[in-house]
Amino acid sequence: MRTSQFLLSTLKETPSDAVVISHQLMLRAGMIRKLASGLYTWLPMGLRVLRKVENVVREEMNAAGALEVLMPAIQPAELWQESGRWVQYGPELLRVKDRHEREFCVGPTHEEVITDLARNELNSYKQLPINMYQIQTKFRDEIRPRFGLMRGREFIMKDAYSFHADQASLQETYDRMHQAYCNVFSRLGLNFRPVQADTGSIGGTGSHEFHVLAESGEDDIAFSNVSDYAANIEKAEAVPREKERAAATEDMRLVDTPNTKTIDALVQGFGLAIEKTIKTLVVHAAEEGKLIALIVRGDHELNEIKAANLEQVASPLQMASEAEIRAAIGAGPGSLGPVNLPIPCIVDRSVALMSDFASGANIEDKHYFGVNWERDLPLPTVADLRNVVAGDPSPDGQGTLEIKRGIEVGHIFQLGTKYSEAMNCQVLGENGKPVTLTMGCYGIGVSRVVAAAIEQNHDERGILWNDALAPFHIALVPLRYETEQVREATDKLYAELTAAGYEVLLDDRDKKTSPGIKFADMELIGIPHRVVVSDRGLAEGNLEYKSRAETEAQAVPLAEILPFLQARISR
């Protein structure tokens, strides 16, 4: 491809509304253009990268035995009402009416549509298992679209759905898809981690997320420094570092603590170690009209997903108001604790192993110091309530946890029978009786992968594409292309490289465009290999080669350029 025949739309300045680096660089490199809030047009440069992601995804899905389909983006409300999600999904679901006043939605996901397809097309266990996927545009009406393609309203997704006669069959396909996802992200050259995850609003019994590691990621992921254990921070089990509770060395005493409403104030005002303090958080209980207290150590954070999953706690999690707390306990936030607490409480595992700790006294401006379980009060119900922190023991018993930021680019779920039961999706089983199908679903944010790859691979000059993702393998930059010698050598090399199967962008812009601008554009776009043709180099029988990942260029004999590039370019 020649730049004279291509839409090369690079920008010198960063648009003011672009915050994250992927958004900035995709705009500056001429990959995308904003149409409206959360909506983007893919330009030729960006579309070349997007298609490469799609092709790898498609190849791995086909290799895993999945069948490609294409479902409508517009879905009838009746299907969503059948599953119960018409009401549950909330304002992110864009609802529309046709000219006949029939209700539809713009699909954010396709569980209902595929389940409807399965119940109409499948009738026997002999047709199972079956796994169907599509690569298609989705729409979620995000309240605040931001970060470019990282959190837009319209996006491209690969979503697959599998149907099974039993859990064992689902597990087999789930494992195969897990491996297929690992293959996809490995082939794309990304530094990623598959992690255990909460099933969230999709539902089901088990799930894994796939995260590209990047400092700009929105999610915290925890993983062992020794084993393969990894989990989303919402899911990671918090194992106490202490093996047993230390013996009591202090007597419990009531202390005046005026204007001490936070852990920091307690620590600084009374010289306490933060590890000897606790936080008491009051939430709505599962029993209507009741409250329950959740207690974590002062230096730990409540994991709201874990809390909401407790049978004693209302879901979704709802914090009690100050008025509700005062009515139930007689004291306000900042003065609460387990001693003489008039409502039930659950303590975190780490709290259960504390001794000589400080807690609110359930009396305004007073705390108990030197509190010890069993001696001063019975140990209440114990549960895993907190987020893990770096240095915690790995739940698999191997090593300790590290925590890094990640960008979620894939998610796989074992749905079970959530949708098939709601929509009566059955086949005749081996015994001739109806069997409700067990389902799995598997998503990859195809357009998000492009942005995540940039978040992980960039420098001060622009994008750092690898060979698998780059819009072009080679930037061929002639200096003084208008001269006969340079043009002939460049055109001959261009023909040889394209004949060898390389994707080449020949920068044939005229002499008004300086070499510096050409080089800067190619580095901004992130083409991984640059070859420069010049009068001086040709006089010496050489071309100049520079890797995008390196700072220094090198001379390569013209006769050796093909084998030289073949040794460096992975395809």
UniProtKB/Swiss-Prot annotation:
<dbReference type="Pfam" id="PF03129">
    <property type="entry name" value="HGTP_anticodon"/>
</dbReference>
<dbReference type="InterPro" id="IPR044140">
    <property type="entry name" value="ProRS_anticodon_short"/>
</dbReference>
<dbReference type="InterPro" id="IPR045864">
    <property type="entry name" value="aa-tRNA-synth_II/BPL/LPL"/>
</dbReference>
<dbReference type="Pfam" id="PF04073">
    <property type="entry name" value="tRNA_edit"/>
</dbReference>
<dbReference type="InterPro" id="IPR036621">
    <property type="entry name" value="Anticodon-bd_dom_sf"/>
</dbReference>
<keyword id="KW-0547">Nucleotide-binding</keyword>
<dbReference type="InterPro" id="IPR004154">
    <property type="entry name" value="Anticodon-bd"/>
</dbReference>
<protein>
    <recommendedName>
        <fullName>Proline--tRNA ligase</fullName>
        <ecNumber>6.1.1.15</ecNumber>
    </recommendedName>
</protein>
<dbReference type="InterPro" id="IPR007214">
    <property type="entry name" value="YbaK/aa-tRNA-synth-assoc-dom"/>
</dbReference>
<dbReference type="InterPro" id="IPR036754">
    <property type="entry name" value="YbaK/aa-tRNA-synt-asso_dom_sf"/>
</dbReference>
<comment type="function">
    <text>Catalyzes the attachment of proline to tRNA(Pro) in a two-step reaction: proline is first activated by ATP to form Pro-AMP and then transferred to the acceptor end of tRNA(Pro). As ProRS can inadvertently accommodate and process non-cognate amino acids such as alanine and cysteine, to avoid such errors it has two additional distinct editing activities against alanine. One activity is designated as 'pretransfer' editing and involves the tRNA(Pro)-independent hydrolysis of activated Ala-AMP.</text>
</comment>
<keyword id="KW-0067">ATP-binding</keyword>
<dbReference type="GO" id="GO:0004827">
    <property type="term" value="F:proline-tRNA ligase activity"/>
</dbReference>
<dbReference type="InterPro" id="IPR050062">
    <property type="entry name" value="Pro-tRNA_synthetase"/>
</dbReference>
<dbReference type="GO" id="GO:0005524">
    <property type="term" value="F:ATP binding"/>
</dbReference>
<dbReference type="InterPro" id="IPR004500">
    <property type="entry name" value="Pro-tRNA-synth_IIa_bac-type"/>
</dbReference>
<dbReference type="InterPro" id="IPR006195">
    <property type="entry name" value="aa-tRNA-synth_II"/>
</dbReference>
<comment type="subunit">
    <text>Homodimer.</text>
</comment>
<keyword id="KW-0436">Ligase</keyword>
<dbReference type="GO" id="GO:0006433">
    <property type="term" value="P:prolyl-tRNA aminoacylation"/>
</dbReference>
<dbReference type="InterPro" id="IPR002314">
    <property type="entry name" value="aa-tRNA-synt_IIb"/>
</dbReference>
<dbReference type="InterPro" id="IPR033730">
    <property type="entry name" value="ProRS_core_prok"/>
</dbReference>
<dbReference type="GO" id="GO:0002161">
    <property type="term" value="F:aminoacyl-tRNA deacylase activity"/>
</dbReference>
<dbReference type="GO" id="GO:0005829">
    <property type="term" value="C:cytosol"/>
</dbReference>
<dbReference type="Pfam" id="PF00587">
    <property type="entry name" value="tRNA-synt_2b"/>
</dbReference>
<keyword id="KW-0030">Aminoacyl-tRNA synthetase</keyword>
<keyword id="KW-0963">Cytoplasm</keyword>
<dbReference type="InterPro" id="IPR023717">
    <property type="entry name" value="Pro-tRNA-Synthase_IIa_type1"/>
</dbReference>
<keyword id="KW-0648">Protein biosynthesis</keyword>
<comment type="similarity">
    <text>Belongs to the class-II aminoacyl-tRNA synthetase family. ProS type 1 subfamily.</text>
</comment>
<dbReference type="InterPro" id="IPR002316">
    <property type="entry name" value="Pro-tRNA-ligase_IIa"/>
</dbReference>
